Amino acid sequence: SSLWLHMGAWGPRRVSTDDTAIVSAPFKTVNNDYSLLDASDLVFIDAPGTGFSRIIDKEMGGSGDPKEFYGSDEDAMAFADFITQFLNTFNLWNSPKYLFGESYGTYRSAALSYILEMGKGVGLNGVIMLSQILSWDNIADLAQANPGMDLPYQLALPSLAAAAWYHHKLPDQPEKLDPLLREVEEFSMGEYAMALSKGSTLDSASSAKILQRLHKYTGLPETYIRKANFRISGPLFEQNLLANNYKVVGRLDTRFTGYSMDPLGKQPDFDPLEAAIFSVFIASANNYIRSTLRFGQDMTYHPFGEGVGGNWDFRHRTPGMPHEIVGNVMPDLARAMSYNPRLKVMLNMGYFDLATPYYEGIYEMQHLPMDPALQKNISYAFYKSGHMVYLNVPSLKEMHDNVAKFIADTH
């Protein structure tokens, strides 16, 4: 649902957060000094089956079928239909228009930009992304299930280094983060990429050199790195960085920590960020909607898709391709930007995010299949926060100012 952006970032009221602190009920909401209402009107759309939206199926007297909505392409089309109907209803066709997506919402926004621009005649001024993922092949969580595809390990490594730096686990702890990240980025796409490409033919001298560098950048023991075959996935890192303290670090935000439920396990049983903030947001949103807005008294607000689970169809028909593939909307965004060369794109990424590592976002943007001249239409902003950048209030203020300027500069 949209409650995270609504109650965490851009709405007129927001959940009071103290960065990584864990709080207990009663939770507080405060006036949001960083709402984007000073820069734009805001329309929060809950995907079908989330929030108060319901799919009216036969049991409810309708003819709706979850299969019509629970899929990458189906979801994007539902959003496109809603947006065009909204423009009709409120006569907003001539207004500047922007998409803002967070996490999966960035994937949706890329697909949606193509549908709106080339299928619906809706000209967009900008697409704003927070914590981007446009290709599932690049995700650090799933790397072990896709042997031979080593790119996710390279793209995640700078974020692993950021986490180890934050928790003071680096053997040679630098004072500043940014120079470290530039060094790791260069290593990831250079020596590390070359070593991984050699697979089982990597010689012992090169192995020792790569092993030493990975230990330097992650703080993990060399024996563990060797057992992992130099390929450190997100879950393995989250489980092992603070293993000596019987703790795990967050996936969505590696600054968050929690007690390990299975110290001998391969991956954490839960995400400490989820444990820290999900109940806070859900309780606060329900209280605000029902007490202040006086809406939904007899309804259940679903923060996540009710009954979606494993029923989501990740297949996507890439523009210009005859067959569906699983999960890559980079061509969609590239075609939208090529069709409308005035369309601007903004990326906002947190350094401590392992769900969608910041360098993966950079890589995807730099590899969009379009004329390189259009790269000038892409801008980047990075924050010392995680997947939900807005949990860190200084980062929220910084992101507000960056996004507000982007909007002002593009209409």
Feature map (PLM): residue ranges:
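A catalytic-pocket lid/entrance helix-loop region that shapes and gates access to the active site
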Residues: 8-17, 117-219
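Short alpha-helix in the alpha/beta-hydrolase fold that links the catalytic acid
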Residues: 111, 230, 343, 357-367
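Glycine-rich nucleophile elbow surrounding the catalytic serine of serine-hydrolase chemistry
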Residues: 101-114
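N-terminal cap/lid subdomain of alpha/beta-hydrolase-fold enzymes
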Residues: 1-68, 366
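Alpha/beta-hydrolase fold nucleophile elbow
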Residues: 92-104
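Alpha/beta-hydrolase fold catalytic core
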Residues: 200-355
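Catalytic histidine-centered segment of alpha/beta-hydrolase-like enzymes
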Residues: 384-395
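Alpha/beta-hydrolase active-site loop
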Residues: 47, 67-88
